Amino acid sequence: MKWTKFAAAVSAVVLAMGTSVCLPSGLTGEMTANAESGSYNYAEALQKSMFFYEVQQSGKLPEWNSVPWRADSMIDEDGNETDIVPGGWFDAGDHFKFTLTNAYSASILAWGYMEYKDAVDKAGLGELYKNNIKWGIDYVLAADRGNGKMVGTIGDFTGGSTDHNIWCSAEVYLRKHNLNNGDWERPYDIIENSTVSALSAAVLAQGYMLFKDTDPEKAEEYLEHAKDLFEGADKFRDTKDIGGMAGMYDTSTWVDDCMYAACWLYKATGDKSYLDKIESDYIPNFPQENQSTDWKYTWGLAWDDTTQAAALLYAQITGKEEWINHIDKHIRYWMNEGSAGGLKPFEGKVTPGGLSHLTNWGCLRHATNTSFLAKLASDTIFKDDSAKSQKYDKWADSQVNYCFGDNEENMSYVLGMGDKQPTAIHHRTASGIHDDHWNELGQESGGEEGWQTEYAHTLYGALIGGPDNTGSYGSYKVSDYQYTEVAIDYNAGYTAALCAMIDDYGGEPLADFPPTETPKWAEWEMAAVLNGSGASYTEIKAWAMNHTAWPARVQKNISYRYYFDVSEVLAAGLSVDDIKVEGKSQQYGEGKQGYAEVSGPYKYEGDSTGNTYYAEVKFLDGRAIQPTGQSEHRDEVQFRISVPDAIDGKPTTGAWDPSNDWSYEGVEDATDLKKPDSINSHITMYVDEILVWGEEPDGTKAVPGADLGITPPSTTSTESSQSSSGGNVTLWGDSNEDGEVNLADAVLIMQMLANPAKYKITDQGKLNADVDTNGDGVTSGDAFVIQKYVLGLISELPEKK
């Protein structure tokens, strides 16, 4: 599992109570302005778009994947990847894999890089970009089944429990599939579809061109498959066989995709037969406008319409005036110049902020797709007409900049960028949802039940669907997926356009990206209520819970301890041997993964008095506790601790008193396991005998991520240290003066910076908190350093430069 990324870098502090503050440079959502001609740092935007594609990676992740909260997915309990075709990208906010959108997206990404390679390389993003393209290309290659046949869809597209009915993170999705279906392999289909085969041929031809000099053997394999797939697509000339894509991606035309593929195969091979095929077979069948002999210039580039992409490629290759004029019509149509130029009017609407809004469903993907074509046309087929080139280029820039905040809402529709962004995002893994209840995500309130509203992760670089045709972005919910979803095809043309923007305006990627996120909530947790009590016993009903999201995961060896004091038992003349610990009812039956063995009492060695013992609840296989649903994320066990009512006929009255028991604190007042008052930090949970939740009676506390190998740093003695601003430091990093250094100190710093009227740090606390050695007082940089210390990334405070 690629869990070690969790400790590979350090993030900005995630605040308690939802407080928003300015964080260290590069860790915020703020998009830095470019010092040169452009309005924004387009290299940063491109860098973050690559991050989004890495979030979408399925299967065993490559070492270069930089997403700190992602891990391997679609693997069985033995660690084997089980999809019939491994790897590839998840399509959108779900976990389907479609060869169609993988091929289309990788092709548009490749096109952008190939046209603006020097600029992307100069920005230092070339290797990262090619890594991500190759991930998509290799999936397409593996999906080829020969003679034009392709694996079309991988995912739960049959039966009642389909992919879209499941809301959980990618890392645990296959466990939910297994729970529902009893196996570890997702369904797939093999289809004969000209669109899928042709787009696959196109991107494999591009792969040959991209990698023929650095990996000639792999490049030749790409080209061989590209030729075969093109032959199959041309032979089928049909798009009706869509298999599991039905209702999601209903392909409709083939000639555009075959022409697009033929152009790329010609560029890859120089074989004129591909141009001959275009002229003899595809141009005569090229789509036309309704009730007109004009070639179709309306609508726009998308996964089901590569008409204009094919036309632009053909115009570039041949230089034929009629095709150059055709592209001119298409761009003017998008600029809504129809009435003045003898063209059909734009089918959508131009918003007050200048967005050419084609349709409510992913409007920004359509606008940025066309922006890429317009910028490329300006740089190639229109380059000798400076007025036209500048005009079209300016329009294209406006569509891209609209996404970053030059719009009616002053909102960035690119996540993780800008001061204001949409709050409801249709993306399962980014949400970190553990109980399959997602309706309140991004809303102000979780309702009476307190459902999760906060996202676990920032989905940096993802282009969201966008506003309505008035330029308004309403109070959308996650279910309004036309506006709130993200997808690999949404980012494709946008990313290609960014390559052109970097070519025009330059830019620099962030040096400290991506940040590692600090968990926003406890990943492992215990809750308990009183299930029954009497003069001689206490019966507890407890939940062991898995709310992991950094990354989402399961663990096999899980146990927890309930601590109790035996002093009154001993005072009554009884011995520890008279105490009985026994299991009662529980969620899983004997022999099942989630079944627990209840045992004890065991002496707790951390109590010098010798009076603290504990009952242990150990699960047969804790992987049953998985963050995939309302019943799966927790495992309920009821257990009783008791003494005999009488021994040798003598009552034991007074021998049992739970009021001084470490774990009993709060239990008597807890009302419901579903409510916050039942959360019990004095019942400690362990993974592989490592403390992951709670506090032991001797004060030992769990460390976030301990089950991933993150260990607490040793405390540095600082009693006589001087702060950079003068004065004695009692303990470096201890901003709240509780004698410890942990995340609470970082949180207090950020809260104080955000709301100093409400959150106070004493003068002594400020001395302790100034750990970044910059001599600038207490800043967000100090919180940043404290996090690194808590995560074990630095060994002492203050930080040494």
Show where each model-derived region lies:
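Sec-dependent N-terminal signal peptides of Gram-positive bacterial secreted proteins and lipoproteins
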Residues: W3-S25
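Cellulosome-associated attachment modules in secreted, modular CAZymes
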Residues: T19-G26, T711-K801
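Aromatic (Trp/Tyr) and acidic
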Residues: E36-F51, V55-G112, T153-L199, V203, ...
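Aromatic-lined, polymer-binding surfaces characteristic
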Residues: S197, A201-F211, A219-K267, T298-A315
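Low-complexity, acidic Ser/Thr/Pro/Gly-rich terminal tails and inter-domain linkers that flank the onset
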Residues: G506-Y537
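Short beta-strand elements of extracellular/lumenal beta-sandwich folds
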Residues: G534-V566
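A surface/secretory-pathway sequence property marking extracellular, secreted
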Residues: S567-D621
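Terminal connector regions
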Residues: G606, G610-Y613, I625-P627, S631-P712
